[in-house]
From Swiss-Prot:
Similarity section: Belongs to the class IV-like SAM-binding methyltransferase superfamily. RNA methyltransferase TrmH family.
Gene Ontology molecular function: RNA binding; RNA methyltransferase activity
Protein name per Swiss-Prot or TrEMBL: Uncharacterized tRNA/rRNA methyltransferase BB_0516
Documented EC number(s): 2.1.1.-
Binding residues annotated for S-adenosyl-L-methionine, in chain numbering: G179, I199, L208
SUPFAM superfamilies, alphabetized: alpha/beta knot
Coiled-coil blocks: none
Listed PANTHER family: 23S RRNA (GUANOSINE-2'-O-)-METHYLTRANSFERASE RLMB (PTHR46429:SF1)
CDD domains referenced in this protein's UniProt entry, alphabetically: SpoU-like_RlmB (cd18103)
NCBIfam families assigned: rRNA_methyl_3
Amino acid sequence: MNFIYQKKSPKTKEIEQLAKTQNIKIIRINTNELDKILKNKDHRGFALKLKLEKNKNVKTQTKDFENLLETFKKKENAFILLLDEIEDPQNFGAILRTAEQFSIDLVITTQKRSAKDNSTVLRTSSGASQYVKKMTVTNINNTINLLKNYGFWIYTGDIKGQDINKIKINDKKIALILGNEGKGVHKLIKENSDFLIRIPTSGKIDSLNVSVSTGILIFEIKRQLNLL
């Protein structure tokens, strides 16, 4: 891991001291070199180079998931977020940032047609992607069935769903599903859900950005459960 910076400032001095305590190598380079490394992205004069942890294979993750579900049996409340083919890494990063702030227990993504952990996700999430527990599955419907066996109720965001303000949520184990930026949630997943919910809006366009919707739905569900 390397801490790379362009010029000294009170902020870089503070970060440099922190880097030293963590035995992180410090490298000073000029502006052009930093622009080239970061492909001219807004870097505020410094950067951290690190290696992202590789995802476990799906088979290993499935076993970990089952073990995790066993631990949820001992918890009074649990909240899992499932993302059905969220493809934009900036949306994924923003969702992970929200998930971290609201202490979501697990974020599940699909193996295919989903954004992967990368530098864009890390940056958009402001580092939250490194704190959120995540796993990948091949089939969300199979995952839903497993969650139901462990007492989870499935809530899915859908434009034709019930107004979330007009339903009473009192389930202790919640799984919230959000869908692809363009297509939304797959039909079979909606059919396998316990509730379809929507956010009431009054604008001229018909939907919110998926990362915004995620934050609003998580907040409202947690508010109703007195978990804020």
